[in-house]
């Protein structure tokens, strides 16, 4: 009888371990579609930004455009399925994967150890760091002597929010849910500066006269990569092979020249683009 009870406890423990492995940090079951299920359905759902020009945005004709969108279209084409683009915000990228609302996230998703506990990242396709933009009238070039009365704009759920909270806890953060709202706040003078991916603040300054990126690189050098639900091994493996194959045709340089060159010019191309998942 004791042996039977012991065996039952071991079996129960194993089942609980498997159940936990299929759950995110919130304890909710992670839902995803395998590669075959996506192909059988005829449609892939990819999460992108809709307000973050030039990476993911909706143009004047109501069409999605941008660096991430260009990549998403190629993924769908090579999968042999239709593409359904799903508008996402920084704070809900992980949630959209875990609940099965999207199959893949391509929304300027910076790879971090914390995020890798909740989603699986594929090979990278872009380099990135944090940057800080501020008005020309008072350019912020360092955070070490921050004025206690000033506030810093960040977007909730971004690496900028995490980095500043951990490394500069005394800086007051003015948080927004969307890129568009953060951009409007900066233009309206709601805060002294705005911290975000350097690619994004550089683009903002180039498109908005009167602003300067005083801190072009803050914190560590990171990468941006596609993300899938934790445990979705078949889809992850396919994306990695796809990125390697695309590298042989310099796909991401073509993507840059089609979507980013008007904003950044050619000077940033080789430093930002990652081909074949291989960082320099």
PLM feature spans:
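Periplasmic-binding protein-like
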Residues: 127-134, 202-243, 262-280
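A structural signal for short loop-to-beta-strand junctions that line the ligand-binding cleft
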Residues: 35, 67-68, 116-125, 212-216, ...
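A ligand-binding cleft/hinge motif common to bilobed small-molecule-binding domains
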Residues: 95, 109-117, 165-166, 187-221
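Flexible hinge/capping segments at coil-to-helix
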Residues: 37, 134-152
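Extracytoplasmic small-molecule ligand-binding "clamshell" domains
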Residues: 27-108
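Hydrophobic/proline-rich hinge and linker segments of small-molecule sensing/allosteric domains
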Residues: 46-50, 121-142, 226-230
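C-terminal motif of bacterial Sec signal peptides marking the signal peptidase cleavage site
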Residues: 18-22
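Ligand-binding clefts/hinges and TM-proximal coupling segments of bilobed small-molecule sensing domains
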Residues: 25-29, 159-176, 213-215, 243-280
């Amino acid at each position: 009888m004791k042996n039977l009870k012991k065996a039952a406890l071991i079996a129960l423990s194993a089942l609980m371990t498997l159940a936990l492995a299929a759950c995110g940090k919130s304890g909710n079951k992670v839902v995803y579609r395998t590669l075959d299920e996506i192909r059988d359905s005829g449609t892939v759902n990819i999460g992108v930004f809709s307000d973050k020009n030039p990476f993911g945005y909706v143009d004047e004709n109501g069409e999605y455009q941008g660096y991430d969108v260009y990549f998403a279209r190629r993924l769908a084409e090579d999968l042999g399925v239709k593409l359904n683009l799903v508008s996402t915000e920084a704070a809900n990228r992980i949630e959209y994967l875990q609940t099965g609302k999207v199959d893949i996230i391509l929304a300027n998703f910076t790879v971090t150890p914390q995020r890798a506990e909740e989603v699986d990242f594929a090979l990278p396709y872009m380099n990135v760091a944090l940057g800080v933009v501020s008005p020309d009238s008072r350019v912020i070039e360092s955070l070490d002597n921050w004025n206690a009365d000033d506030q810093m704009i960040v977007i909730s759920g971004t690496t900028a929010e995490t980095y500043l909270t951990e490394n500069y806890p005394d800086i007051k953060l003015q948080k927004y849910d969307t890129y568009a709202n953060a951009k409007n706040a900066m233009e309206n003078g709601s805060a002294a500066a705005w911290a975000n991916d350097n690619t994004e603040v550089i683009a903002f300054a180039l498109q908005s006269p009167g602003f300067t990126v005083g801190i072009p690189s803050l914190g560590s050098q990171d990468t941006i990569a596609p993300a899938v639900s934790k445990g979705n091994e078949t889809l992850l493996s396919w994306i990695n092979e796809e990125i390697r194959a695309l590298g042989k045709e310099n796909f991401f340089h073509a993507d840059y020249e089609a979507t980013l060159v008007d904003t950044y010019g050619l000077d940033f191309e080789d430093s930002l683009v990652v081909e074949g998942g291989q960082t320099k």
